[in-house]
């Protein structure tokens, strides 16, 4: 459609076959530059849409990660946060998982997220976007980010 972002179809991968009606509708945006049109640096909130969060496979039902993505996408997002669905964050035992990253910043992977956590996740992403290095002071981090952190990855470069 005019004005839509370029996208690529999910075809399965990383051992996760694209099955069920949810897989046909899921589209992953093509990579975008990390700088907004105003010159501010944006951060990316990656959401694993294939996370089943310990539930058995059900081809007719959207996985918990996909439900989380829908919940996040339905909310107003912070201006410097881009939400990108991904097929797998390799946190299957701790799904649904999200990851925060940005140029020159520490990156984080968080697990055990639910659709009900969406407002807090976006608040945490906004706090992350407001930092120069990706490190939100411990006491200022939202509780779910303090308690559900799976990994902290140093900046690349």
Please annotate each region the language model reported.
Residues 1-10:
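Extreme N-terminal basic, low-complexity initiation segments
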Residues 29-54:
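Polybasic, low-complexity association/targeting segments
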Residues 38-46, 69-91:
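Immediate flanking context of iron-sulfur cluster ligation sites
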Residues 56-65:
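Glycine- and acidic-residue-enriched helix-capping/strand-helix junction motifs
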Residues 64-81, 113-114, 119, 123:
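Ferredoxin-type iron-sulfur electron-transfer modules in oxidoreductases and energy-metabolism complexes
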